[in-house]
Amino acid sequence: MLRVIVLGAAAGGGVPQWNCGCPVCRAAFDDPRLARTQASLAISADNAHWFLINASPDLRQQIIATPQLHPRAGALRHSPIAGVILTNGEVDAVAGLLSMREGAPFSIYAHDKVLAILRANSIFNVLNESIVARRPVATDQPFEPLLPDGTPSGLEITAFEVPGKGAWYLEGRTHPGGDSQSGDTLGLTITDKSTGQSLHVLTACARVTDDLKARLAGAPLLLFDGTVWRDDELITAGLGTKTGQAMGHIAMAGDDGAIAALADLDIGQKLFVHINNSNPALLAHSAERGQLETAGWQIPADGTEVTL
C-alpha cells in the first residue's frame, strides 16, 4: 500500500512568515490552526520505512508532529527515515538536511546538479558521507531507493525534468539570465511495486507542457505546485517584486494556470502543495478556495495522509 504524508504544505518561510502581516499571515498568527510548515512529504510502501521528498527547514518540527517518523521505542538511536529525495536545490528543499546530522544512516537521492550544490557548500559536510550516502539520480530512469541495510524499499521512483528555474541563491552565478537548466527542477513518479499504484509529485513547475499532460493523465493522485493564485500577486500585494513565473512557479488560476491546464486529465485526487503565504486560497472561506475546490482540488493541512 502506497502512503504519502504531507509534512508541510507551505512555500518558503511557511505560514505565517516570521515578519509578515499580510491577510493570510495575520489570520494564521491569530489562529495557529491555520499555520502550515514549509513543503515536505513522506512516502512509504510498508508504513515502516519512509522516504522524504525534500527536507524543509521545518523538518525537526515536522518529525515531532508525525508519529510515523518517531524513533522506535526502546532504541537509543533509530529513525524510520530511510532516505531523502531532493527535487531541486532551493533552500526550502535542502536546509532540513542539517537537522539530520546525528549519525543515523540514510541516503540522499538527487540530480548530479543538486549533489554538486551540496558538495560546494561545506556546511553539508556535517552529514558524514560514510554514513549518509549521496546517490545520483538520472532523469527518466526508474530506480528503487534502498533501506539503510541495502534491502529494497518496495518503491520505484522515476524523476523527470519539469519547466522551472535554478535556485534563487545561485542566480547570476551558474544561471546567467536566470533561465532553467537541466536538473534544476524535477518531478517524481512514485510507484508501489507490489500494487502498481502510483502518484506524481511536482513541488515546483513553471508551466504545463503537452508532454507533462501526457505523463500525468489518469493518475490516481497528484501533488502539484500551488505557490501563487495569480502570477502577479506578490507584486500587487506589495510583498515582493517577482511574478510567479519569474520564480519558476505556475499560477493556480487563469487561462494558463494549473487548474485550467490540468482540468481534463482524469486525475483522481489533486492536492496543491508549496503554497505561498500570499495565496488567498489558503483561507478556507475565500472565493479562491471555493473555486479550486469546485474544480476538484484540495488544500491539505500539515499531517494530511493519503493511502493508495
Curated annotation (Swiss-Prot):
Pfam families listed in its UniProt record:
Lactamase_B_2 (PF12706)
Q: What InterPro entries does this protein map onto?
A: Metallo-B-lactamas, PQQ_synth_PqqB, RibonucZ/Hydroxyglut_hydro
Q: Which GO terms describe its biological process?
A: pyrroloquinoline quinone biosynthetic process
UniProt keyword terms in alphabetical order = PQQ biosynthesis, Transport
Biological pathway: Cofactor biosynthesis; pyrroloquinoline quinone biosynthesis
Coiled-coil residue spans: none
SUPFAM superfamilies (alphabetical): Metallo-hydrolase/oxidoreductase
Family the UniProt entry places it in: Belongs to the PqqB family.
Alphabetized PANTHER family for the sequence: COENZYME PQQ SYNTHESIS PROTEIN B, HYDROLASE C777.06C-RELATED-RELATED
Q: Which NCBIfam families match?
A: PQQ_syn_pqqB
What is this protein's function per UniProt? May be involved in the transport of PQQ or its precursor to the periplasm.
What protein name applies here? Coenzyme PQQ synthesis protein B
Give the taxonomic lineage as stored in the record. Bacteria, Pseudomonadati, Pseudomonadota, Alphaproteobacteria, Hyphomicrobiales
